[in-house]
Amino acid sequence: MTITLPEVRMTMPARPEGVAVVRQALAGMADAMDFDAAVVADMKMAVSEACTNVVVHAYDDSAGILEVDIRAEEEALTIVVRDHGTGIQPRPIRRDVPALGLGLPLIAALSDSFELRGSAGQGTEVRMTFAYSRGDDAADVRVDGRWNPEPN
């Protein structure tokens, strides 16, 4: 018997009202999969931050697209938020260094793993994973596909 794990794919205009749509879809899927309420709250906060970054930063004065994939895997739920906008120059995400923006460090702190990919003019992809059962270990943080040398 083959079990098909749920997957949700959304593509919408990168507008503020889309953030709530993504958050509700994620909450519904996570609740149906019996995630702990505290983990669902972390997921919703992290996905809100990632989507808000797209709405605020990805597109220079023009309409753009927000893409979100939510996929159940054997041991975790993976959420990918991407845009095709101005891009970001990835750099190590450090939780101990104050920065103007708190979104990416917050996503890294809330998720069990975090990966940031992007380049100038090519858009940005934020991938975060939430394990079904959580340990006490800090999140694995990758920047542009490589382990972050200074995740803490």
Sequence positions of predicted segments:
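Short helix-loop "hinge" at the ATP-lid/N-box region of the Bergerat-fold HATPase_c
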Residues: V54-A58
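Conserved polar catalytic motif of the HATPase_c/GHKL fold
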Residues: E49-N53
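Short beta-strand/loop element within the Bergerat-fold HATPase_c
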Residues: I65-E75
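Glycine-rich/acidic phosphate-handling loop/turn and adjacent ATP-lid/helix
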Residues: A76-G101, G145-N148
